[in-house]
Amino acid sequence: MKLLHVDGSILGPHSVSRTVSAAIVDRLRAQHPGLEVIYRDLAGTPLPHLSGAVLAGAQPNATNTPDVQHDVELGRQVLEEFLAADIVVIGAPLYNFTLSSQLKAWIDRILVAGVTFRYGPTGAEGLAGGKRVIAVVSRGGLYGPGTPAAAAEHAETYLRTVLAFIGITAPEIIVAEGIALGAEARERALAGALDAAAALKAA
């Protein structure tokens, strides 16, 4: 069994989403001896943002510069990691009302027409179903249902939309929010998220 662990936070050891995503991976390792884990730190080793040159360079028989070819091959590697994974764990902080740009760059490499989705007579069809996806969404403020800022939350909502688009319709999402509202609020949010991580089912 293969697990892909992706972190999008820029805060390193101070990151709540990283702390909780690591706890999830540790729990799954304990539950699945022999679990193969691939880790992508998208802040430590950022992916280049998708460009027109790379889109063109990925076409059959394209003639690429070395830089573009390297980017094309990196994109293929990222996509293959995702396709090969049985479980995907994502650390997804909310920055300025949406995902980090580092995580968005990764998403742009896994949404590939004809591979993870396709268009048919009735619209788009996801092709990447069957994976277990667990995401940790950390938020500095309060954006949950019924809060004044709920409509400004575009991390969890975006993730759910993107994953459903490629066929993953039941992601497991753990939310830690209010982490910028003081030390006590941060500790409560982190403890609650870690409790939720500890309660995840084995398979």
Curated annotation (Swiss-Prot):
<keyword id="KW-0288">FMN</keyword>
<dbReference type="InterPro" id="IPR029039">
    <property type="entry name" value="Flavoprotein-like_sf"/>
</dbReference>
<protein>
    <recommendedName>
        <fullName>FMN-dependent NADH:quinone oxidoreductase</fullName>
        <ecNumber>1.6.5.-</ecNumber>
        <ecNumber>1.7.1.17</ecNumber>
    </recommendedName>
</protein>
<dbReference type="InterPro" id="IPR003680">
    <property type="entry name" value="Flavodoxin_fold"/>
</dbReference>
<dbReference type="GO" id="GO:0016655">
    <property type="term" value="F:oxidoreductase activity, acting on NAD(P)H, quinone or similar compound as acceptor"/>
</dbReference>
<feature type="binding site">
    <location>
        <begin position="138"/>
        <end position="141"/>
    </location>
    <ligand>
        <name>FMN</name>
    </ligand>
</feature>
<keyword id="KW-0285">Flavoprotein</keyword>
<dbReference type="GO" id="GO:0010181">
    <property type="term" value="F:FMN binding"/>
</dbReference>
<dbReference type="GO" id="GO:0009055">
    <property type="term" value="F:electron transfer activity"/>
</dbReference>
<feature type="binding site">
    <location>
        <begin position="15"/>
        <end position="17"/>
    </location>
    <ligand>
        <name>FMN</name>
    </ligand>
</feature>
<keyword id="KW-0560">Oxidoreductase</keyword>
<comment type="similarity">
    <text>Belongs to the azoreductase type 1 family.</text>
</comment>
<dbReference type="Pfam" id="PF02525">
    <property type="entry name" value="Flavodoxin_2"/>
</dbReference>
<comment type="function">
    <text>Quinone reductase that provides resistance to thiol-specific stress caused by electrophilic quinones.</text>
</comment>
<feature type="binding site">
    <location>
        <position position="9"/>
    </location>
    <ligand>
        <name>FMN</name>
    </ligand>
</feature>
<comment type="function">
    <text>Also exhibits azoreductase activity. Catalyzes the reductive cleavage of the azo bond in aromatic azo compounds to the corresponding amines.</text>
</comment>
<dbReference type="InterPro" id="IPR023048">
    <property type="entry name" value="NADH:quinone_OxRdtase_FMN_depd"/>
</dbReference>
<keyword id="KW-0520">NAD</keyword>
<comment type="subunit">
    <text>Homodimer.</text>
</comment>
<dbReference type="InterPro" id="IPR050104">
    <property type="entry name" value="FMN-dep_NADH:Q_OxRdtase_AzoR1"/>
</dbReference>
<dbReference type="GO" id="GO:0016652">
    <property type="term" value="F:oxidoreductase activity, acting on NAD(P)H as acceptor"/>
</dbReference>
